[in-house]
Each structure stands twice: as structure tokens, then as C-alpha cells.
A protein has these predicted regions:
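Structural signature of beta-strand start/N-cap positions in the alpha/beta core
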Residues: 3-4, 96-97, 104, 130
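A short, Lys/Arg-enriched amphipathic alpha-helix followed by its capping loop at the start of a domain
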Residues: 26-31, 93-103
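Active-site neighborhood of HAD-like aspartate-dependent phosphohydrolases
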Residues: 1-41
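Substrate-recognition "cap/lid" segment bordering the active-site pocket of phosphatases
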Residues: 85-86, 106, 112-146
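Short beta->alpha linker loops
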Residues: 19, 43-47, 71, 86-90, ...
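Alpha-helical substrate-recognition element adjacent to the catalytic core
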Residues: 22, 30-59, 68
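Metal-dependent phosphoesterase signature
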Residues: 34, 56-92, 101
Length: 146
């Protein structure tokens, strides 16, 4: 018997992945690099530590990943605050159905907790979730998640 439903966030609940390529390409240009779209796409679903290691391996140790993540947070937050959280079609209806069936729900994501909470607040979905687990809360993120 199914007792709970666990959702991934980026790409499943919210269409935030479409912001990743232009955001990271903007950041890399500002820092003096050119980041191919394919490189950004390979970031999807992975934790910050693993992505940062790949960035440094690919672009060099001098790539300031800490600044890159700060800029990413700033640019994505600015976009979402201006345009709203891009919900995937049918999400609210699905969540209502799951609640009607009495099932618990949770989010499992590599996104930082403060951003998850911000997106949920902006989209009005906070009350639909019973728990959140982020990549920072587990010892090993994708591709071998705990």
C-alpha cells in the first residue's frame, strides 16, 4: 500500500531547469569563461560540491565557484521574484488529489533548503508537503543518493 509520494523539485514540480543554462552562461561570461549548454545540463540533479568540483576540473582551479553559486542564487531569485515560480502543468491538481487520498508528501532535491522554501511560499504550495530533504542533508548526493 502506498503511504507517501516523494517529489523531485527542479524539472518535475517547477520548470526551473530552463533557467539554468542562461544563468550559468551569464555567470561564466562575467567571470571570464564560456560554459557550454551541455556542461550546464550535466549539472542537473547533482549537489553543489560535485558540480563545483567539475567546474574547477573543467575550467581551472581559479574559477570562483563560491561566487558563481552566490550569483546563481541572486539571478534565479531575481527572475522568480519578477516572473513567479514556473509550475509544471498539473502539479496543483496532483497535489490536491494526493491530499484527498490521505497520502503524505515530501520533496527530495539537490536545491538548497532556503530556495526550496522560497519557491514553495511563492507558489502557495507550502501546505502540501510534509517534509523536505536536500542534498546538503545527506552524506552522498546523486548519482548515489542516500
Amino acid at each position: 500500500m502506498i503511504k507517501a509520494v516523494i517529489f523531485d523539485m527542479d524539472g518535475l514540480m517547477f520548470d526551473t531547469e530552463r533557467l539554468a543554462v542562461p544563468t550559468w552562461q551569464r555567470i561564466s561570461r562575467e567571470l571570464g569563461y564560456e560554459m557550454p549548454a551541455e556542461f550546464v545540463i550535466n549539472m542537473f540533479g547533482r549537489n553543489v560540491s560535485a558540480i563545483s568540483a567539475d567546474i574547477k576540473k573543467t575550467f581551472g582551479e581559479e574559477f570562483d565557484t563560491e561566487l558563481g553559486w552566490k550569483l546563481r542564487k541572486q539571478y534565479v531569485t531575481e527572475w522568480i521574484d519578477k516572473h513567479g515560480v514556473p509550475l509544471k502543468p498539473g502539479l496543483k491538481e496532483l497535489l490536491k488529489y494526493i491530499r484527498q487520498k490521505g497520502l503524505k508528501t515530501a520533496i527530495a532535491t539537490s536545491t538548497d533548503l532556503h530556495l526550496v522554501e522560497h519557491y514553495l511560499n511563492l507558489s502557495g504550495l507550502t501546505d502540501y508537503y510534509d517534509g523536505i530533504v536536500t542534498g546538503q542533508m545527506v552524506a552522498q548526493g546523486k548519482p548515489a543518493p542516500d
